[in-house]
C-alpha cells in the first residue's frame, strides 16, 4: 500500500491506496500546524482506526502547497514509516508535459489533479478544484498541460464579503429555494453558489473556444458537490483526484 498526503491551505488529506484503489481517506486541519510528534500521533490514530499499521505501507507521497507544513510532515512521515516520502514536484514524470511558463511555480495540487484525471478521463481535459481557491487546469489532446485559471474559492469569497461588511448576516452556504433571494441571507448564499456556478460555466466556454474543441470536465475539492450541481455544463464530480 501507499500512503498519500495532500497538504492544502485548509486541510490535510491522508489516503491509503492499494494499487489504484482508494482504501480510506481522512482529513485534518492544516491551519493549526502540529509538531513532528503531533503528526505522528495523528497518523497512528488514523491507521489504527482502519485496522492498519505503518508496516502495511511500502511508501508514501506528499503533495503540498504549504511549505511551512511540508518539512515537518515529511519528517514525521519518515520517522513513522521508516523511509523518506516522495515529494510531488514538476520534475517528476507525471504522464504529461508541462508547457506553462515557470513550471516550478505551478502548485502541486494542480499537478496532482491532472495526474489523477488523465488516467480516468478522455482528453482534452479540464480539471476544476473548488477549494480555498478555485483552480482550472487545461490539458490538450497531446497530453500537454497548457495552464489554466485561478479565482477565489467559494468559502474564501464568502468570508471576505462578511469580513468587509458590517451588517450582512453570517450563515452556511447553501442554495435557497429560489434564485431571487427573499432575504439578505438568501441573497448572499444564492449569489455565492449561482455566481460561482455561472462563472464556471462561462470560463469552460471560453477555454473550449480557445482550445477549438470540447473537453472532458472534471471537478473535485470541498465545494464541488455544493456548486457543480448548479452548473449547466456536463461536469464529472470526482472527489478522489
Q: Can you say where each PLM-predicted feature lies in the sequence?
A:
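A generic secondary-structure signal
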Residues: 45-50, 116, 120, 203-207
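Gly/Thr-rich phosphate-binding beta-strand-loop-beta motif of the actin/hexokinase/Hsp70
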Residues: 1-24, 117, 123-145, 161
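Glycine-rich phosphate-binding loop plus the immediately following alpha-helix
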Residues: 31-38, 106-108, 113-122, 146-192
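ATP-binding/phosphotransfer module of carbohydrate and carboxylate kinases, centering on a glycine-rich
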Residues: 2-4, 158-241
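Short, well-ordered alpha-helices that flank and scaffold nucleotide-derived cofactor binding pockets
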Residues: 18, 45, 75, 79, ...
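N-terminal glycine/serine-rich phosphate-binding loop of ATP-dependent small-molecule kinases
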Residues: 1-92
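Glycine-rich phosphate-binding loop signature in dinucleotide/nucleotide-binding domains
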Residues: 50-55, 120-122, 210-213
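Short beta-strand-loop/turn "lid" adjacent to the catalytic site in phosphate-handling enzymes
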Residues: 52-105, 142-148, 153-154, 182-193, ...
Amino acid at each position: 500500500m501507499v500512503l498519500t498526503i495532500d497538504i492544502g491551505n485548509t486541510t490535510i488529506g491522508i489516503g491509503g491506496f492499494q494499487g489504484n484503489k482508494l482504501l480510506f481517506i481522512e482529513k485534518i486541519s492544516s491551519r493549526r500546524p502540529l509538531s513532528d510528534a503531533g503528526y505522528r500521533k495523528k497518523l497512528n490514530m488514523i491507521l489504527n482506526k482502519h485496522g492498519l499499521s505503518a508496516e502495511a505501507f511500502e511508501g508514501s507521497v506528499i503533495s503540498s502547497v504549504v511549505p511551512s507544513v511540508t518539512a515537518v510532515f515529511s519528517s514525521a512521515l519518515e520517522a513513522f514509516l521508516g523511509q523518506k516520502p516522495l515529494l510531488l514536484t514538476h520534475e517528476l514524470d507525471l504522464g504529461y508535459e508541462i508547457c506553462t511558463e515557470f513550471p516550478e511555480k505551478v502548485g502541486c495540487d494542480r499537478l496532482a489533479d491532472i495526474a489523477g484525471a488523465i488516467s480516468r478521463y478522455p482528453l482534452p481535459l479540464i480539471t476544476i478544484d473548488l477549494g480555498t481557491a478555485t483552480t482550472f487546469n487545461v490539458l490538450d489532446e497531446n497530453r500537454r498541460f497548457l495552464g489554466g485559471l485561478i479565482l477565489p474559492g467559494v468559502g474564501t469569497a464568502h468570508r471576505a464579503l462578511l469580513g468587509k461588511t458590517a451588517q450582512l448576516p453570517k450563515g452556511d452556504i447553501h442554495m435557497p429555494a429560489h434564485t431571487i433571494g427573499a432575504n439578505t441571507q438568501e441573497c448572499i448564499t444564492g449569489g455565492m453558489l449561482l455566481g460561482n456556478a455561472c462563472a464556471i460555466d462561462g470560463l469552460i466556454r471560453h477555454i473550449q473556444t480557445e482550445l477549438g474543441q470540447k473537453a472532458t470536465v472534471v471537478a473535485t475539492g470541498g465545494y464541488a458537490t455544493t456548486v457543480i450541481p448548479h452548473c449547466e455544463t456536463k461536469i464529472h464530480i470526482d472527489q478522489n483526484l
